[in-house]
Amino acid sequence: DRVHPILHGLEVVDRRVLLLSIIGGFGTEDLARITGLHVDEVTHIIARVEPVVAAASRTGVLIIEDEPYMAELLSVLVEQTGHWVAGIAYTRDEAMTFAEKRDIGLILSDIDLGNDVCGWTVVHKIRETLGYRVPTIFITAHPERLEEDGCENRDGVVPKPFDIWRVREAVNNAVHLNASIFA
C-alpha cells in the first residue's frame, strides 16, 4: 500500500484532517466535529502538517531526455522555478532507476528518447512501478505523437523549440495543481 510522498510519514488522522481541510475546505470546528477530535487536537494537527504543505510546493523533478545539452538546460530551468532535480535520465533504464530510488513529484520527458523508445511508455511504466500518478509534462519536437498514440494523463505539453518562460510556467502549474490535490 504505497502512499504519495507528500503524505508519507503522516498518521492516518493527520492525513484525514489535512485532506478534509484542503480539499473539503472545512474549518477547525467542522474538522473537530467530523473527526470526533477536540478543537485543540485539530489545531495541533494542522500546525504539525503545515511543514508538509509547505514542502509540497517544492518538489523533485525527474528529467527524461536523451540529449545532454537539452537535459542540462531543463535542469537549470527546474532549479530556477525553486524545485530540485531528482535525476536526469538519458535512457529508459536510468529513468526507472531514479523513479525507484528518489521521491519524484514531477516528470519532464521527451517523447523520442532514441532507439525506438517512447517517453510516454517510460512514464507509464514509472507510474505503474510507483503505484501513483506522477504529474508529467512532455517537452517534445513531436507533440502530435501524443495525440496519435492516445497518450492521456499528461499535465502539459511544451513543443520544441520552446520558450523558457513556457517551461517554467508548465512546471509551476503542474506542481501547484498536484500540491493542491495532495497537500
Please place each PLM-identified region on the residue numbering:
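A short pre-motif secondary-structure segment
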Residues: V17-L18
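Helix-turn-helix DNA-binding module
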Residues: G24-I45, V49
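C-terminal output helix
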Residues: D30, F162-N172
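Conserved acidic segment of CheY-like receiver
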Residues: R58-Y69, L74-V78
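Acidic, metal-coordinating helix/loop segments flanking the phosphotransfer/catalytic sites
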Residues: I88-L106, E147
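Active-site residues of response regulator receiver
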Residues: D110-D112
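Short amphipathic alpha-helix used as the core "switch/output" element in two-component signaling
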Residues: C118-R133
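Hydrophobic/aromatic residues positioned on beta-strands within the core alpha/beta folds
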Residues: I137-T140
